[in-house]
């Protein structure tokens, strides 16, 4: 009988950690070799920023030197928010005995940000610091060691926040902790004072209030208990609630004088604006003695104006008048004339709607020229010429914030009176319009920036108000959003659990020790592993995404996410299905949260026809269905339903989704494979933000996998699946016989003989053909943005998806392995010195190695292949690496992992922030699949079976299920499960054997 050892989290136990530091590899010429999952020192500290906070609750980062950065606690990213705050230690009787508890400031911080020529007077960079620092992470804990020849103390800083797989609520708390541990390294008794000092970085015009052991930073004009609390648990703490009030640098100068002279000040809170506050904790340290002071950070910001896709303010578009350009959370607006333009994004982004109608004017010139930008939704976001109550001309943007010139020929309307109506009737992405510089002229080539004397400027929007224009409100709300709880903007989950900031503090104080113990259980179990160090580093570093601003959790607990994070707003909204396909961490660590995504996709985002929006509204609500579905996202979602069902073991959950899953698959068949040949031939939108025309290996492999998943689910529920079995066979045949060239899978580009209209007529992101050269390219090569004969790194991703979801890969496995080896051979670069990239090169450039998205080893590269083809994406690197490992190519897979992690060495990129279209990009959580690839460990809760298919022989590794987590090991072909939290009910072990090791 197999022995199962279970440890409940409340039981005391000891782990023996076996953490490998692994091999070392050169990163860049002249740079020392990197050791994975190890300590960062020197220049490798430069860009480290380690997220601390709860899932969907906001975050701050602990930098490699010990400073705080990226303070983002008010429901949006604030990437460059480095608050004026610092911890310090003063040692009495020691020359130069006062130091900020940080290492030296990296020079990029001084000269890299904006206003770098102004001296950085709003930062703490000029204060004395420790000479030496080192950083090590064991997610979710980060540890910094500080040393200084002048300070007889060894200092250890530990930052963390709760992260407990299967306990999503306690992992979503708005708080974090930084612990400062001091050890007296001298032979003398040391009298010291620890201090924590901060301006009101929440609102410089706000108030500072008292809380036990510390202070609360409160926004102005807020009567409720909102804001951020900073406090210690030490009974000896004394607090100065109001720094010196003066001018210039008075406040911070006096504050430092008090810290460095050990002048403990205890000013009481005041009613007005307080510039800053300090906490002082005196300490006596005997020789060799160690003491720890913990700084607690708790916050409560229950409200936001964040919406995506929901019409929240009917008729409020345009009412704030002209705009001076780019509005908050808007991409850069360019190409307008003068100082102002009309921009319906003003006052609420895409959520506000309304119409604006001009006074009548007489048409007495041949042409009307103007500028337009914004969304490409002619029926909803448009400029219209109205004559006799009818719309005779219409123009819209092209899904761009760059204004472009338009011209209407008014020859047929001479002498008539007309009005201009500007409409914004969309609350969805690109649901805004921008216009400027309406000019009547007889000259078709009139220069809008300096109209001639014969031209008539109807409107240039340079006045402060919209004189001569009338606002019109729509007669009814634009969409039936399905919102029934009255919450029309993002409200974080924690605001439903806690009534105010004090309630957060109380809960944290009551549960802190238990939550630390449980979080340590996760850390210890994860790193108690014999897996390669580069793998542990890749997986654990990217778990930081779940603590970043990329992730939100709305008021009712449902999960919602961006693709990544821009500097001040999320990047690409709505739990995008074709990006989150790759992310394999959440479904194993927090399966209940992952299942809310399936429920949203199939029960909210999908209409009766089976069309599924690949982006989710915020708040979560019914969307419009006025753009393509995403083939890879929608088909991948079907496989994820299978995966999440097997992880949960919940048949009732599967039954509740099954009708929608069937409707979804039927839609995919009707829309992209209408003749049921087994491949996606009609144009299909995908993760590259374009449409592939004709059958391709990438999306058809998703189709094959989705059919496989649906057949398995149908048979389990005793549903008829004969049609889908036949189609599955045809799909397999198509992939292996028609889309495999003997070495790898490819695309058969097709744009004629389809049900779809011409590429010039269907909606698309940026694939317009309005210029002659684009039309000529269409005639000679076909649609832009295809990959054709290319060797696509994602070219067989549907089979990777099948494997990580627990499905068999139905394709010829020699073909699959051949494709993956071709990707390794052709697409992997040891450096980028001779690689050109006109797209987004910062992901990998110069001395960086990486895996290109696509190459054309057999020639016939399109003139304009898909738009990101020359880039390197970490999420795809990990996908390919794990799939190679599954096929026995362990060293090839690990080489890709190492090249990827070498780029994130701390010198030039943050090791805990892998970027793609934004920071903390979700696709990078494909790294979690490498754990499964190496070990073949998968727990099936439906059959209570633990599967093992090791590619590396004996091992010990982490495992997380729907009900608990621990470690699993294989030794001499015998499995042993150690459950350290919750429980894992195993009735059977199934160990597969292979010849790959």
Locations of the language-model features?
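Non-catalytic C-terminal accessory modules of carbohydrate-active enzymes
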Residues: 56, 67-69, 75-168, 844-847, ...
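Short Pro-Gly-centered flexible turn/kink motifs
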Residues: 59, 190-192, 284-299, 479, ...
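Aromatic-rich carbohydrate-recognition surfaces in CAZymes
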Residues: 88-93, 97-101, 109-120, 184, ...
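Extended glycan-interaction surfaces of carbohydrate-active proteins
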Residues: 397, 532-567, 592-625, 671-695, ...
């Amino acid at each position: 009988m197999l022995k199962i050892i279970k440890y409940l989290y409340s039981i005391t136990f000891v782990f023996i950690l076996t953490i490998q530091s692994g091999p070392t590899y050169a990163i860049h010429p002249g740079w020392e070799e990197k050791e994975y999952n190890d300590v960062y020192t020197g220049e490798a500290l430069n860009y480290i920023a380690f997220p601390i906070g709860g899932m969907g609750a906001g975050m701050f980062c602990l930098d490699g030197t010990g400073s705080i950065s990226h303070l983002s606690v008010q429901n949006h990213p604030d990437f460059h928010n480095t608050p004026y705050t610092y911890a310090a230690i003063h040692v009495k009787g020691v020359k130069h005995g006062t130091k900020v508890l940080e290492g030296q400031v990296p020079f990029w911080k001084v000269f890299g940000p904006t206003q770098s020529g102004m001296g950085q007077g709003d930062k703490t960079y000029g204060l004395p610091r420790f000479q030496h620092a080192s950083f090590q992470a064991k997610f979710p804990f980060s540890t910094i060691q500080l040393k200084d020849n002048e300070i007889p103390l060894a200092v250890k800083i530990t930052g963390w926040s709760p992260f407990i797989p299967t306990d999503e609520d306690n992992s979503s708390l708005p708080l974090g902790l930084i612990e400062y541990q001091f050890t007296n390294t001298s032979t003398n008794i040391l009298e010291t004072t620890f201090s924590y000092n901060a301006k009101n970085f929440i609102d410089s015009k706000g108030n500072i209030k008292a809380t036990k052991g510390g202070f609360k930073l409160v926004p102005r004009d807020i009567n409720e208990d909102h804001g951020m609390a900073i406090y210690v648990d030490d009974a000896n703490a004394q607090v100065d609630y109001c720094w010196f009030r003066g001018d210039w640098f008075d406040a911070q100068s006096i504050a430092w004088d008090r810290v460095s002279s050990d002048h403990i000040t205890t000013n009481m809170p005041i009613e007005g604006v307080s510039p800053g506050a300090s906490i002082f904790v005196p300490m006596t340290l005997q020789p060799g003695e160690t003491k720890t002071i913990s700084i607690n950070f708790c916050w409560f910001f229950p409200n936001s104006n964040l919406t995506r896709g929901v019409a929240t303010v009917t008729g409020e578009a345009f009412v704030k008048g002209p705009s001076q350009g780019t509005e908050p959370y808007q991409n850069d607006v360019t190409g307008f004339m003068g100082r102002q333009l009309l921009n319906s994004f003003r006052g609420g982004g895409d959520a506000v709607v309304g119409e604006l109608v001009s006074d009548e004017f007489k048409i007495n010139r041949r042409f009307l020229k103007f500028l337009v930008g914004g969304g490409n939704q002619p029926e909803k976001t448009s400029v219209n010429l109205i004559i006799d109550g009818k719309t005779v001309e219409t123009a819209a943007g092209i899904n761009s914030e760059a204004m472009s010139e338009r011209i209407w020929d008014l020859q047929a309307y001479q002498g008539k009176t007309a009005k201009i109506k500007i409409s914004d009737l969309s609350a969805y992405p690109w649901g805004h319009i921008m216009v400027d510089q309406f000019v009547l002229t007889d000259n078709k080539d009139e220069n809008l920036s300096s109209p001639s004397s014969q031209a008539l400027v109807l409107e240039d929007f340079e006045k402060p108000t919209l004189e001569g224009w009338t606002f019109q409100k729509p007669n009814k709300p634009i969409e039936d959003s399905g919102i029934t709880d009255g919450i029309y903007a993002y409200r974080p989950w924690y605001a439903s659990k806690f009534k105010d900031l004090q309630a957060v503090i109380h809960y944290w104080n009551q549960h802190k020790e238990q939550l630390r113990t449980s979080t340590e259980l996760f850390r210890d179990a994860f790193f108690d592993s014999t897996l390669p160090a580069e793998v542990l580093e890749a997986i654990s570093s990217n778990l930081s995404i779940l603590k970043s601003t990329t992730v939100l959790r709305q008021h009712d607990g449902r999960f919602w996410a961006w693709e990544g994070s821009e500097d001040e707003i999320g990047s690409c909204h709505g739990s995008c299905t074709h990006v989150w396909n790759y992310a394999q961490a959440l479904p194993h660590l927090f399966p209940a949260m992952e299942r809310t995504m399936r429920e949203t996709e199939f029960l909210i985002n999908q209409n009766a026809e089976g069309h599924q929006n690949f982006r989710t509204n915020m708040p979560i609500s019914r969307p419009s269905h006025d753009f393509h579905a995403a083939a890879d996202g929608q088909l991948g979602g079907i496989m994820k339903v299978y995966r999440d069902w097997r992880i949960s073991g919940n048949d009732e959950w599967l039954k509740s989704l099954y009708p929608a899953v069937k409707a979804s698959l039927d839609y995919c068949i009707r829309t992209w494979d209408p003749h049921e040949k087994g491949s996606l031939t009609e144009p299909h939108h995908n993760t590259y933000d374009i449409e592939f025309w004709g059958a391709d290996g990438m999306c058809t492999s998703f189709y094959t996998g989705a059919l496989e998943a649906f057949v398995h689910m149908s048979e389990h529920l005793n549903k008829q699946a004969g049609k889908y079995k036949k189609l599955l066979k045809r799909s397999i045949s198509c992939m292996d016989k028609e889309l495999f060239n003997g070495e790898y899978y490819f695309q058969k580009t097709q744009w004629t003989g389809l049900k779809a209209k011409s590429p010039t007529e269907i909606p698309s992101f940026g694939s317009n053909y309005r210029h002659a050269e684009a039309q000529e390219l269409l005639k000679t090569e076909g649609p832009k943005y295809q990959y054709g004969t290319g060797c696509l790194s994602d070219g067989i991703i549907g089979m990777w998806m099948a494997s990580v979801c627990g499905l068999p890969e139905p394709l010829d496995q020699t073909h699959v392995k051949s494709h993956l080896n071709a990707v390794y051979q052709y697409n992997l670069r040891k450096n980028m010195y001779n690689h050109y990239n006109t797209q987004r090169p910062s992901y990998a450039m110069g001395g960086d190695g990486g895996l290109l998205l696509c190459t054309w080893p057999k020639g016939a590269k399109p003139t304009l292949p898909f738009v990101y083809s020359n880039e390197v994406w970490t999420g795809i690197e990990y996908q390919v690496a794990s799939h190679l490992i599954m096929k026995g190519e362990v060293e090839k897979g690990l080489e890709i992992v190492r090249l990827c992690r070498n780029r994130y060495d701390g010198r030039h990129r943050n090791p805990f922030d892998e970027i793609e279209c934004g920071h903390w990009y979700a696709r990078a959580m494909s790294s979690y699949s490498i754990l499964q690839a190496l070990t073949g460990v998968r727990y099936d809760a439906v059959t209570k079976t633990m599967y093992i298919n090791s590619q590396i022989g004996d091992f010990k590794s982490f495992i997380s299920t729907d009900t608990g987590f621990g470690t699993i090991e294989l030794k001499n072909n015998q499995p042993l499960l150690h459950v350290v939290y919750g429980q894992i009910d195993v009735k059977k072990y199934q160990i597969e054997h292979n010849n790959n090791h």
